[in-house]
Amino acid sequence: SIIREAQRLIRHPDFRGVISDLGGPTANMYAMGCGRNAASPCKVGQCLFPGVCASLETGHKAQIELLRAIRSLPGVKKAFVASGVRHDLVMADAKYGECYLEELVKHHISGQMKIAPEHTSVRVLDLMGKPGNECLIAFKDLFYRLTRKHGKKQFLTYYLMAAHPGCTLDDMQELKRFATSELRTNPEQVQIFTPLPSTRSAAMYHAGKDPCGKHHIFVEKDRLHRQRQKDVLTARAAIGKPRRPKP
């Protein structure tokens, strides 16, 4: 139980009232699951790509209740969700998604929240199995509308990736332009892709083929060229302040 774990943390002699991150790898998938019969095999195989599966129960109500329960515990001054929020799931939940994000803005963000679009090239996003830019922009606009509504000085930061299988230098230049013009940011949280065992991306890296194995894809393996992809993105550019949509 997360509540019991929080209670144990509160009893620790070094606890000072702040839970630094309730997020984890996928903060807002708490209590989500497949609405299909468990005995019935799934023919889709992916819950979140190319879109959120209609059978996935994406409601954020249970997590809203969890957050409220944790911050009501005696001894808890603040409980932050610093990372791990899947922005596509927030936007897919028409009933509770905005309420969940508003709950975060009001009570659970210390100043900035990190989300992980990873890229903006449609071709690279398809290989990653990640949602498109429309979802990202919609989430960004909603986030800043809510921060404006509640008078909060909060910001989004973006986790991005260089040299993923299929990603070229041109793709990184496209990502740089998007980050500068649409996200109004000079990216700093940039990782060079590392092929981890038993992952789909690692299979693409070693095989040089798309996930279905039907088409060859470009894979940058030269160390200096992989670093160059990152350097394109982290180079400083003159930008204005983040644009906040009108309420």
Provide a role label for each language-model segment:
Residues 4-157, 162-165:
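Conserved SAM/AdoMet-binding glycine-rich loop
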Residues 25, 132, 167, 176, ...:
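A broadly tuned "polar low-complexity/structure-edge" signature
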Residues 45-54, 109-116, 143-150, 180-195, ...:
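Short, surface-exposed, charge-dense and proline/glycine-enriched linear segments
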Residues 63, 74, 117, 140, ...:
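Functionally constrained cores in energy, signaling, and assembly domains
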Residues 96-99, 163-182:
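Catalytic cores of alpha/beta
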